Amino acid sequence: MRRLLIPLALWLGAVGVGVAELTEAQRRGLQVALEEFHKHPPVQWAFQETSVESAVDTPFPAGIFVRLEFKLQQTSCRKRDWKKPECKVRPNGRKRKCLACIKLGSEDKVLGRLVHCPIETQVLREAEEHQETQCLRVQRAGEDPHSFYFPGQFAFSKALPRS
């Protein structure tokens, strides 16, 4: 069974997720991520999403946590015009690989967000681990810290008798 699951997982990872296949929460998360990316001051050109590598939404008591991995490519438009349909992807434009962690509350209120889109050549292993830690913080946004049990949270040890 395990032999079948590994090739299936590799195939699904290579195929990716189309934008049409995203849930409503995932589409909203992608929209929030693109808005956040284009607000960033160093970004001067508009970027367009070219593919969604993975998309997961998880319900929590405070809202829905959406984790997205997607790719962006530079367009011929300036960043203020990023929503315009006439913005076409530049064939040799810069490419970015993004990780977005968005926590949506009731009525799509954004409780927390993390959008990290380094240029594809700058992706480092240590940076990915750091981003995962920040992503977990976004995942817990708006949640009651006492509503979850974490192993070791209530660990006690019996003291040795005094001799």
Curated annotation (Swiss-Prot):
Its main location: secreted. GO terms for molecular function: signaling receptor binding. It comes from the Eukaryota. It is found in: Secreted. Coiled coil: none annotated. Induction: Inhibited in psoriatic lesions. Activated by tazarotene in skin rafts and in the epidermis of psoriatic lesions. GO terms for biological process: antifungal humoral response; antifungal innate immune response; cell differentiation; chemotaxis; defense response to Gram-negative bacterium; defense response to Gram-positive bacterium; embryonic digestive tract development; inflammatory response. Expressed at the highest levels in placenta, liver, and white adipose tissue (WAT), and to a lesser extent in many other tissues such as lung, brown adipose tissue, heart, ovary, kidney, skeletal muscle and pancreas. Within WAT, expression is enriched in adipocytes as compared to the stromal vascular fraction. Expression and secretion increases dramatically with adipogenesis. Highly expressed in skin (basal and suprabasal layers of the epidermis, hair follicles and endothelial cells). Residues 158-163 form a propeptide. SUPFAM superfamilies: Cystatin/monellin. Keywords: Chemotaxis, Differentiation, Disulfide bond, Inflammatory response, Secreted, Signal. The lineage of its organism: Eukaryota, Metazoa, Chordata, Craniata, Vertebrata. GO terms for cellular component: collagen-containing extracellular matrix; extracellular matrix; extracellular region; extracellular space; platelet dense granule lumen. Adipocyte-secreted protein (adipokine) that regulates adipogenesis, metabolism and inflammation through activation of the chemokine-like receptor 1 (CMKLR1). Also acts as a ligand for CMKLR2. Can also bind to C-C chemokine receptor-like 2 (CCRL2), but with a lower affinity than it does to CMKLR1 or CMKLR2. Positively regulates adipocyte differentiation, modulates the expression of adipocyte genes involved in lipid and glucose metabolism and might play a role in angiogenesis, a process essential for the expansion of white adipose tissue. Disulfide bonds join C77-C87, C98-C117, C101-C135. Residues 1-20 form the signal peptide. This is Retinoic acid receptor responder protein 2. The keyword Disulfide bond applies. Secreted in an inactive precursor form, prochemerin, which is proteolytically processed by a variety of extracellular proteases to generate forms with differing levels of bioactivity. For example, the removal of six amino acids results in chemerin-157, which exhibits the highest activity, while removal of seven amino acids results in chemerin-156 which has slightly less activity. Some proteases are able to cleave at more than one site and chemerin forms may be sequentially processed by different enzymes to modulate activity levels.
